């Protein structure tokens, strides 16, 4: 299935690229989300007519993501969780907990933007967490997990 991308898609292509994907990926993910359109002559002509509009929108989204990344630069948050005396958490601290903690201190963050490379934290301590704010913008923040008896 050949598609024209209307925005940058990680591991696939950039705005305006004509890509070939498996039919299920195109039909069930890219097309319903409005990320791509079928690569027909009519759609190609319509895309070329609106290319400047799509590029301006992509630039605006990138600028907003970079502004958000600047706010997160050097930011840290403390998350408290019940823990044993050895420092093991009775539960875990995951992406949702981290997103809620940053939102509570005035830095709005969604769960899907938090990237935990090795899964949720199960021990108290300091961790560096990657935030994926845009396809081209990432930021690293510090999360301190404190144990509460």
From Swiss-Prot:
Signal peptide: none annotated. GO terms for biological process: translation. SUPFAM superfamilies: L9 N-domain-like (SSF55658), Ribosomal protein L9 C-domain (SSF55653). GO terms for cellular component: ribonucleoprotein complex; ribosome. One of its GO terms (molecular function) is structural constituent of ribosome. Keywords: Ribonucleoprotein, Ribosomal protein, RNA-binding, rRNA-binding. InterPro entries: Ribosomal_bL9 (IPR000244), Ribosomal_bL9/RNase_H1_N (IPR009027), Ribosomal_bL9_bac/chp (IPR020594), Ribosomal_bL9_C (IPR020069), Ribosomal_bL9_C_sf (IPR036791), Ribosomal_bL9_N (IPR020070), Ribosomal_bL9_N_sf (IPR036935). It comes from the Bacteria. NCBIfam families: L9. Belongs to the bacterial ribosomal protein bL9 family. Binds to the 23S rRNA. This is Large ribosomal subunit protein bL9. It comes from Xylella fastidiosa (strain 9a5c). The lineage of its organism: Bacteria, Pseudomonadati, Pseudomonadota, Gammaproteobacteria, Lysobacterales. The gene is rplI.
């Amino acid at each position: 299935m050949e598609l024209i991308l209307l925005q940058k898609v990680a591991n696939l292509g950039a705005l305006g690229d004509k890509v070939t994907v498996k039919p299920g990926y195109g039909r069930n993910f890219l097309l319903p989300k409005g990320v791509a359109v079928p690569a027909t002559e009519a759609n190609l002509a319509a895309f070329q007519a609106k290319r400047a509009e799509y590029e301006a929108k992509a630039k605006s989204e990138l600028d907003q993501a970079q502004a958000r990344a600047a706010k997160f630069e050097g930011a840290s948050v403390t998350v408290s969780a019940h823990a044993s005396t050895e420092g093991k958490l009775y539960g875990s601290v995951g992406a949702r907990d981290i997103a809620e903690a940053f939102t509570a201190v005035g830095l709005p963050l969604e769960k899907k933007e938090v990237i935990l490379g090795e899964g949720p934290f199960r021990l108290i301590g300091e961790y560096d967490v990657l935030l994926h704010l845009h396809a081209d913008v990432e930021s690293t923040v510090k999360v301190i997990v404190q144990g509460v008896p």
